[in-house]
Amino acid sequence: MSLPGLELSQTSAEREFVSAPPTQISLSKGSEWRFEVAFGTAIRVKLLSGTAELFGTELAASQTYAFSGTKAAIYTWHGCTLEVGAGDTISTIDGLGSAGMNGGAVRGYGAGGCQSEYTAEETPMVEYANVHFALEAMRQEAKATGKDGPRVLILGPENAGKTSLAKILTAYATKVGRQPIVVNLDPAEGMLSVPGSLTATAFRTMMNVEEGWGSSPMSGPSAIPVKLPLVYFYPLQNPLEAGASVYRPIVSRLALSVTGRMAEDEDTRETGIIVDTPGILSQGKAGSLEVINHIVTEFAINTILVIGSERLYSTMMRSYDNKPTASASAAASDERITVVKLSKSGGCVDRDAAFMKAVRESQIRTYFFGNPIPSTASAALSASASSTTNVTLSPHAQQLDFDSLAVYNYTISLPDEDEDEYDPSQLGTGDTFIPGGSNEAERAEPQQAEDSSFTPSMPGLAGSSGEDATSAANSAVPLKKVPRPAPTVLANSLLAITHAAPSAPSSEIRDASIMGFLYVADVDSEKGKIRVLAPIGGRVPPRAIVWGKKWPGEVVGLVG
């Protein structure tokens, strides 16, 4: 890039970086190596001697691990020596190197090209290990008495290390042969799914060091056994934006599914569940305590872990400590809730909006195209045994008639939303603007039977069943079918295919679990066609589809 008037060239930081030989880092017992790697760059870490773990999952000796776009820490209980070197530059799916992705992230000048890296002697790992041992004692008691195992709720502000603690407790549980159910209630980040997902997964095997939680089922080799998540879709970033009408009912359905699994699976019943929550619930905003209480009640929580907030800890102590749980067996066993305060790790760093956007894009790309990080673990499964082999998936592209789809959108107005943006799905409360339509909100009679492709789900409309309870439940759900023509803003967004029928009531669509996701690559409103990517081939199932317009929002550049 030339500088105007000076006739000089400015060399990019990526070009200035010269790959240095690997660096050896020695850690004393009870210390950890904290590092940050930008998206688009990668480092390689190898355990040369001793023992080490990343968020509770042990690193194998002499095995090279690749990390990109992450902020993490490698801890050692007894001391170890690590070898850290630079990895390959990773290109995005659209073919552009991500050195300038999301604000111009470039390779740093730390070991291996880390943006930041240092060794820390003070860590809260002893506290976290003590929590694991306490939970293990509760599991042994549950096995002896036939009661349910511990149901753990993790609370804390943003960037306090809640998800890291959930990974540590899960890894330690699986290490001793337990099978915990992990529940993610944070729509900002996906767990084994895309952002906007609320998921529950039973972990029977170890987690993937490079990919965090691991990977969901895919048609390709995997060094770590894949996980089978149960997924629900909440297409909003903030659980308080539609807490009463959308978020809490989905949490109830998820809790019901988890409870049913624990009733049928003795191993998961004894091990219990670990619930990760969004940080906004800990900020004291209106409605947050109601959502926390709903989670505590629905999952029959008996252990609340609070990280990094004295105020929240005090509130939880007053509200729940030593109070009876909501478990069905609580009355007979006199089970009580325990509130525990934990220290926030000094390695927790703030993740800005640009980094979180890159995280969301990476999760969505991985869902459709596989893991872009070159991994020697996946290379070991390849016949070529190439050190740069990575798991690449090929999504199926197809063109669909928009009229053949039942696409629904949540009609919730956000404070920072542009109300002038044209979107046919936001016009009116009925189908007045559709040719031949009429405004059902002004009529007392039910919807005509010939319009079977549309189910009344807007506030104030009477359901075809005529039952007051069902009608009231459906009218409370801010879910409306997107009318034709296909809105152009549908492009570059996600569609969630539910298990609900296309004409199911709005409450049933909201509460339905997800089959999979589509990515809308292009929209032709004149022809009524949309071009989508699907993880598998074949026809799109005739099911109700929920549009992730507000969250995870627009994802540009996924395809060329």
From Swiss-Prot:
Binding of ATP, residues: 32, 71, 159-164
UniProt keyword Nucleotide-binding present: yes
GO cellular component, one term: mRNA cleavage factor complex
Gene Ontology MF: a single term: ATP binding
Main subcellular location: nucleus
Job of this protein: Required for endonucleolytic cleavage during polyadenylation-dependent pre-mRNA 3'-end formation.
Entry similarity comment: Belongs to the Clp1 family. Clp1 subfamily.
Name used for this protein in its record: mRNA cleavage and polyadenylation factor clp1
Organism: Aspergillus clavatus (strain ATCC 1007 / CBS 513.65 / DSM 816 / NCTC 3887 / NRRL 1 / QM 1276 / 107)
